[in-house]
Each structure stands twice: as C-alpha cells, then as structure tokens.
Amino acid sequence: MKKTYRVKSDKDFQMIFSRGKNVANRKFVIYYLEKEQKHFRVGISVSKKLGNAVVRNAIKRKIRHVLLSQKTALQDYDFVVIARKGVEELDYQALEKNLIHVLKIAGLI
C-alpha cells in the first residue's frame, strides 16, 4: 500500500475520532470520515495485548489487503481500523469476512 493511502499524523487520527462516525462488530471497530480526495486513507491500530510484533504486523497486512481489494467502493473516506481481541486467531478468510461485515454495517460497501 502506498504511503498516500495511510493516515499517519496524530492530528488526522484525532480528526477522524472526533468528527467521524464509528461502527463495530466483535472483531473490529471502524471510525470513518468522508473526505474530498481521490482515494481512501487508512490508519490501523492493533494493541500489544493481541501478540508480539510479528503477530500484530501480520494482522495489519491482512487488514490492508482486504481494504485494497475493496478499493473502488471505499473512495473518498479516511478510516481508522481498530482490531479487537480474537483477531489474532482468525485466518485470512475469516478476517476478511468480519471486516467486510463491519463495512457493510456502516453502509460503505
């Protein structure tokens, strides 16, 4: 994923948290804010409680891959995806199913 697709600054995270809407299921919480831009941006938060760095980075890679596969539906939004406890036990298909489920609840896809 290109760096232009990532939310990095604390200011951007705080703006999404304060002005954006949020949706959750058992495995993910998604904060989203509609923006006028040509592509989506995502920030991913995985707690240290979910595992060591290898496990957390694997979860982040899977989340990025799912979001890139839904790229056309997610235009014009900034996201913060927070992984909840239990995500570390999911394989890719289950993680994808849960993440798409929460995106559908939000009405984004």
UniProtKB/Swiss-Prot annotation:
Gene3D superfamilies: 3.30.230.10
The UniProt record lists the keyword tRNA processing: yes
One GO-annotated biological process of the protein: tRNA 5'-leader removal
Record's GO cellular component terms: ribonuclease P complex
Keywords: Endonuclease, Hydrolase, Nuclease, RNA-binding, tRNA processing
Record InterPro entries: Ribosomal_Su5_D2-typ_SF, Ribsml_uS5_D2-typ_fold_subgr, RNase_P, RNase_P_CS
Record flagged with keyword tRNA processing: yes
EC number: 3.1.26.5
Molecular function terms, GO-annotated: 3'-tRNA processing endoribonuclease activity; ribonuclease P activity; tRNA binding
Pfam families listed in its UniProt record: Ribonuclease_P (PF00825)
Catalysed reactions listed for this entry: Endonucleolytic cleavage of RNA, removing 5'-extranucleotides from tRNA precursor
Family: Belongs to the RnpA family.
Subunit (UniProt): Consists of a catalytic RNA component (M1 or rnpB) and a protein subunit.
Primary role: RNaseP catalyzes the removal of the 5'-leader sequence from pre-tRNA to produce the mature 5'-terminus. It can also cleave other RNA substrates such as 4.5S RNA. The protein component plays an auxiliary but essential role in vivo by binding to the 5'-leader sequence and broadening the substrate specificity of the ribozyme.
PANTHER family according to UniProt: RIBONUCLEASE P PROTEIN COMPONENT
Name listed for the protein in its UniProt record: Ribonuclease P protein component
Lineage: Bacteria, Bacillati, Bacillota, Bacilli, Lactobacillales
Gene: rnpA
